[in-house]
From Swiss-Prot:
EC number(s) from the headed UniProt entry: 2.1.1.148
Superkingdom in the source lineage: Archaea
Keywords of this entry: FAD, Flavoprotein, Methyltransferase, NADP, Nucleotide biosynthesis, Transferase
Position of sequence motif ThyX motif: 83-93
Job of this protein: Catalyzes the reductive methylation of 2'-deoxyuridine-5'-monophosphate (dUMP) to 2'-deoxythymidine-5'-monophosphate (dTMP) while utilizing 5,10-methylenetetrahydrofolate (mTHF) as the methyl donor, and NADPH and FADH(2) as the reductant.
This protein's name: Flavin-dependent thymidylate synthase
Taxonomic placement: Archaea, Thermoproteota, Thermoprotei, Thermoproteales, Thermoproteaceae
Organism expressing this protein natively: Pyrobaculum aerophilum (strain ATCC 51768 / DSM 7523 / JCM 9630 / CIP 104966 / NBRC 100827 / IM2)
Amino acid sequence: MVILETPRVFLIASWGSEAVISAFTDALYRGVPWEEAVKAQAPDVIIKRISAFYRQGHWSVFEFMGAQFLVECSRACHTQFIRHRMASYWSESQRYVDYTKREIRFVVPKGFPADLLKRAYEDYARLREGFRPEYARMILPNATAVLFAVQMNARELLLNFAPLRCAYAAQAEIRHVCWQMFAHAWRLWPNLARLVWEDLPSLHRDFCTKVPRGEDCRLYAIKDAEEKHGPLPETPWLSALVHG
């Protein structure tokens, strides 16, 4: 039995890029042959075009970029996550996985009573003596870790998922997951991610709900998530705060 405080997010693969979106602009609107369009994307041109698409609300072009992640979080967090339907999922099944033969994991915030989790697993093990995993699983708590694959395009991740799940109003665990994904997005699509970072407090009307007046809603949400679930592996937005 393993008890984790920090949910985990692994970047598996990605598709598309800001350079590809910029190249599509030349190919579709200027008649430039694709091979030439791909080679002609200067960094300043890419920044200008990504910013223009974003500011003008032409967000559908960002669906041509996306990523695949492997996420490990609690069953409670997993249930919240898969409500975002503009994504593809493949999840660990408690119906078929036998946790008496495979290590069981739990994801809980700091200070959660470990003895309760130990007792739950012992009850599960006793049930497995007479029942299949699909019945024994009913005793497992929402803290039980679930490993799942998710595929999401950049528009869904940065302009729908992030404004909802990176906010302080979201539960700390899924918020921690969201900020980990945001950090990966920053490396993949730096110009779009920076634009979204700047506008996050205004992209959803409830983003700053419950945040004390005068606090930066983003940093307040991050600090609280880290206090409950440990430090984030990457924080690329700090450079944006320093350099403006």
